[in-house]
Protein backbone atom coordinates (compact mmCIF):
# COMPACT_ATOMS: atom_id res chain seq x y z
CA UNK A 1 0.00 0.00 0.00
CA UNK A 2 1.09 3.44 -0.85
CA UNK A 3 1.03 6.20 1.70
CA UNK A 4 -1.52 8.89 0.91
CA UNK A 5 0.10 12.15 -0.14
CA UNK A 6 -0.39 15.17 2.08
CA UNK A 7 -2.45 17.90 0.51
CA UNK A 8 -0.98 21.25 1.32
CA UNK A 9 -3.83 23.68 0.93
CA UNK A 10 -1.71 26.81 1.48
CA UNK A 11 0.21 26.27 -1.76
CA UNK A 12 -2.94 27.15 -3.69
CA UNK A 13 -4.05 30.78 -4.15
CA UNK A 14 -7.72 29.92 -3.47
CA UNK A 15 -7.60 30.21 0.36
CA UNK A 16 -5.84 33.55 0.08
CA UNK A 17 -8.45 34.76 -2.39
CA UNK A 18 -11.37 33.78 -0.18
CA UNK A 19 -9.60 35.07 2.93
CA UNK A 20 -9.04 38.46 1.33
CA UNK A 21 -12.62 38.55 0.09
CA UNK A 22 -13.88 37.70 3.58
CA UNK A 23 -11.77 40.47 5.14
CA UNK A 24 -13.04 42.97 2.57
CA UNK A 25 -16.69 42.09 3.24
CA UNK A 26 -16.03 42.23 6.98
CA UNK A 27 -14.49 45.71 6.64
CA UNK A 28 -17.48 46.96 4.63
CA UNK A 29 -19.91 45.48 7.16
CA UNK A 30 -18.08 47.16 10.04
CA UNK A 31 -18.11 50.50 8.22
CA UNK A 32 -21.84 50.23 7.56
CA UNK A 33 -22.48 49.20 11.15
CA UNK A 34 -20.54 52.19 12.45
CA UNK A 35 -22.52 54.50 10.13
CA UNK A 36 -25.82 53.09 11.35
CA UNK A 37 -24.81 53.34 15.00
CA UNK A 38 -23.55 56.92 14.75
CA UNK A 39 -26.48 58.26 12.71
CA UNK A 40 -28.36 60.72 14.90
CA UNK A 41 -32.11 60.80 14.48
CA UNK A 42 -33.94 64.04 15.29
CA UNK A 43 -35.84 63.70 18.52
CA UNK A 44 -39.60 64.04 18.32
CA UNK A 45 -40.24 65.05 21.92
CA UNK A 46 -42.62 67.94 22.53
CA UNK A 47 -40.01 69.83 24.58
CA UNK A 48 -37.64 70.13 21.66
CA UNK A 49 -40.43 71.20 19.30
CA UNK A 50 -41.42 73.92 21.76
CA UNK A 51 -37.85 75.23 21.86
CA UNK A 52 -37.70 75.25 18.04
CA UNK A 53 -40.86 77.37 17.90
CA UNK A 54 -39.29 79.90 20.25
CA UNK A 55 -36.22 80.09 18.01
CA UNK A 56 -38.43 80.74 14.98
CA UNK A 57 -40.08 83.70 16.72
CA UNK A 58 -36.68 85.29 17.27
CA UNK A 59 -35.81 84.89 13.59
CA UNK A 60 -38.73 87.11 12.54
CA UNK A 61 -37.24 90.04 14.46
CA UNK A 62 -33.81 89.65 12.84
CA UNK A 63 -32.54 92.65 10.90
CA UNK A 64 -31.64 92.21 7.24
CA UNK A 65 -27.95 92.24 6.41
CA UNK A 66 -26.82 95.60 5.11
CA UNK A 67 -24.75 95.89 1.98
CA UNK A 68 -21.56 96.81 3.84
CA UNK A 69 -21.56 93.48 5.69
CA UNK A 70 -22.00 91.32 2.61
CA UNK A 71 -18.91 89.32 1.66
CA UNK A 72 -16.75 90.91 -0.99
CA UNK A 73 -15.21 88.73 -3.67
CA UNK A 74 -11.89 89.68 -5.21
CA UNK A 75 -11.45 88.79 -8.86
CA UNK A 76 -7.86 88.69 -10.09
CA UNK A 77 -7.67 89.03 -13.84
CA UNK A 78 -4.95 87.28 -15.79
CA UNK A 79 -1.74 89.27 -16.03
CA UNK A 80 -2.57 91.75 -13.29
CA UNK A 81 -0.47 92.01 -10.16
CA UNK A 82 -3.21 93.69 -8.11
CA UNK A 83 -6.89 92.82 -7.78
CA UNK A 84 -8.77 95.01 -10.23
CA UNK A 85 -12.40 94.16 -9.56
CA UNK A 86 -14.48 93.79 -6.45
CA UNK A 87 -17.61 91.76 -6.99
CA UNK A 88 -20.68 91.79 -4.78
CA UNK A 89 -22.96 88.73 -4.89
CA UNK A 90 -26.35 89.45 -6.43
CA UNK A 91 -29.45 87.46 -5.59
CA UNK A 92 -31.23 86.42 -8.76
CA UNK A 93 -34.91 85.57 -8.32
CA UNK A 94 -35.95 82.17 -9.62
CA UNK A 95 -37.82 82.11 -12.93
CA UNK A 96 -41.60 82.19 -12.73
CA UNK A 97 -41.93 79.10 -14.85
CA UNK A 98 -39.60 76.24 -15.62
CA UNK A 99 -39.98 76.50 -19.39
CA UNK A 100 -39.62 79.97 -20.82
CA UNK A 101 -40.69 80.57 -24.37
CA UNK A 102 -38.89 83.31 -26.24
CA UNK A 103 -40.98 82.90 -29.35
CA UNK A 104 -41.05 86.67 -30.00
CA UNK A 105 -37.25 86.86 -30.18
CA UNK A 106 -36.76 84.33 -32.97
CA UNK A 107 -34.12 85.23 -35.55
CA UNK A 108 -34.29 83.54 -38.93
CA UNK A 109 -30.96 83.05 -40.66
CA UNK A 110 -31.16 82.38 -44.36
CA UNK A 111 -28.47 80.29 -45.99
From Swiss-Prot:
Biological process, per Gene Ontology: amino acid transport; regulation of amino acid export
Sequence motif VIMAG, location on chain: 75-79
A GO cellular component entry from the record: membrane
Main location: membrane
Cytoplasmic topological segments: 38-111
Claim: Transmembrane helix is one of the keywords in the record: yes
Localization per Swiss-Prot or TrEMBL: Membrane
Family membership: Belongs to the GLUTAMINE DUMPER 1 (TC 9.B.60) family.
Function summary: Probable subunit of an amino acid transporter involved in the regulation of the amino acid metabolism. Stimulates amino acid export by activating nonselective amino acid facilitators.
Identification of the protein by name: Protein GLUTAMINE DUMPER 6
Species of provenance: Arabidopsis thaliana (Mouse-ear cress)
Amino acid sequence: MRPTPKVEIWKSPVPYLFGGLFLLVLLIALALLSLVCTHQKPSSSSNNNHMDEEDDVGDKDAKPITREYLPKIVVILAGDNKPTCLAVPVVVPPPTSIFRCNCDNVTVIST
